[in-house]
Amino acid sequence: MNGQPVRVTVVIDHPAQHFTRALQLLSAEPGVQVHVYYWSAAERVRDAGFARSVSWDVDLLRGYPWRAPEPGRSMSGRIRWLVRQLRARRPQVLICYGWASPIARLALLYCMLTRIPVVLYGDTTWQHSAAQGRHRVLRALVLRVLMRASAGAISTGAFNREFYISCGMDPRRIWPGVCPADTELFGMARAGSRTPPGAGRTPLRIGFAGKLIARKGVDELLRAAALLPSTRDWSVTVVGDGPLMPELQALAAELGLAERVTFRGFANTTEMPALLAAFDVMVVPSRWDMRALVTIEAMAAGAAVIVSDATAVWGPGDLVEDGVSGLVYRSGDPAALGRQLSRLLEDPGLLATLRRTAAARVAEFGPDAFARTMASAIRTLHERAKATTGP
């Protein structure tokens, strides 16, 4: 691209671990000049899903330009702050992560009034939308207006692309993209060659990582594990915390799994690569979920994955292809999950193949792919705008 770089503003509610490296790489892309605006950049936040205050042990704000309002500002003060920032910045393209947060709604309204092209980015699916339940019809109408008013969207998977199209987005204005995890970091922790589970009395190490809340389906994993043969060597490790911790511990005891299931508790960012690399298989038993980035992290760390069909990470050409780069089972059916676990317990060759394929597949879902696809969409959109309105 010749001339000045495209001025790009990215609006996000708060910093997140999986975006840090991606934003660093996007900021380094040629032809784009990126500034990130947060609604809050607080270093310690209360996370209801983990049932605790969380302070991540990595710097989420290093390596890219960003701004956020001072802590303690009122809502009206934050609104005035963002409007001043957008007026001063004069973005040529605005990337909006989601549309439900205050910063997203304000930025979208500002851009509609000032005719700044907006590119939508997120991981919503119709399954997630239906799960919201309330005001469904009104929400659908608002989304249709938003899709038609936006310059385009970045899809983060087949289900997300279908969501945009069903809301009225022209498929020609949807670019393929990535909802990234730091695949390089987790790949570095990948376990080396080890004795296949079942050979030499090596146990099958089954894992879960995430918030202990109802929709994550950890109870389903425990019920499935209870169906595995007690004569075989296997274990389950649950990494994470949340309001259901006591209930899940009681369920494990009730199912006779107290000696096989370990509740590791909350793990911070720098602890996760080694924990996931220690798993033979990661289970994502969500009752509904969007991109479930822990799936990418586990695959990069060398684990095979089993995901429920209520996640949005599977399907032809997506992250998990059933029987190729992972296994899929019907959500709500512990027996089906138990059968998939039994397959890996009985067939070390299948497990080894899935682990190798998973580690190779995630190369397409890392922060470099995010930066590359996002920058390509920005350049294309800017060139189209110039062709329509002139430089």
What role is predicted for each listed range?
Residues 117-119, 126-149, 191:
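Nucleotide-sugar donor phosphate/pyrophosphate-binding loop at the beta->alpha transition
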Residues 136, 147-194, 201:
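Donor nucleotide-sugar binding/catalytic pocket of nucleotide-sugar-dependent glycosyltransferases
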